[in-house]
Amino acid sequence: MKERDSRNQIGDLPFRVKEGFSVYEFIEQLYEANVVERINRFLVKVTFNGKEFLAHLHDPGRLKDLIYPGNLVLIRETKGYKTKFSITAAYSNSRFVVLDSRLHNIIASKFLPEAYEKEIKVGNSRIDFKYDNTYLEVKGCTLVENEIAYFPDAPTERGRRHLKELRELMKKGFNAILLILVMRDDAKCFLPNEKTDPKFSIEFWNSIKEGLNVNIKTFKLVGNKIIYVRDIPLCKTNLT
């Protein structure tokens, strides 16, 4: 596995958060629990303090390497949900991987100028952000294998549609950025997950050929803070 030359990695964002700085802090106490079973996409049974609870999982991915019986997770108390707890992170490769996708746009906004728009209607989709002449879509990534970060970990028709919409915007003269937030710090480079969603992979590479900027950032959980670690490049392939 080789990394792509970072000089060819376009898509730098206007506001550069320094490496090692916090981009989010949980105000709730984080508790260790263990997975009993995943009930459905958004519900997981866990054991905490010797009792079983249902916890909300705000991540629709398969997460087979993270949410499985016996694995260690971090939970926090949440209000406004039918469950008392939400899963915040899961243990993998000697680190906790943040799973709550509600945080993605909050984190992404730290790297943008103050004047931006959110949830802009474009065609049949909504693009996460717009600033100046640039549209930016955010994707969260939790799957890492052999130091390569992969997205998606489940087929995503929505993700493919977003790429098509970004290409249409580029044809109209706008800039477009795909911002990928890798919610762990053990990846050295990124690739679209061709095995899981070959259609997304095709759309990804076609979009880059047509001028899509890609920016990939890694993070780690330290105590109750999410820390920005560094940017990583696309992995070197015959398509880069």
From Swiss-Prot:
Q: What GO molecular-function term can you cite, just one?
A: DNA binding
| Superkingdom of origin | Archaea
Write down the Pfam families for this protein, in alphabetical order: SfsA (PF03749), SfsA_N (PF17746)
Cited HAMAP family: SfsA
Family that this chain belongs to? Belongs to the SfsA family.
Tell me what this protein is called: Sugar fermentation stimulation protein homolog
**Which species is the source of this protein?**
Saccharolobus islandicus (strain M.16.27)
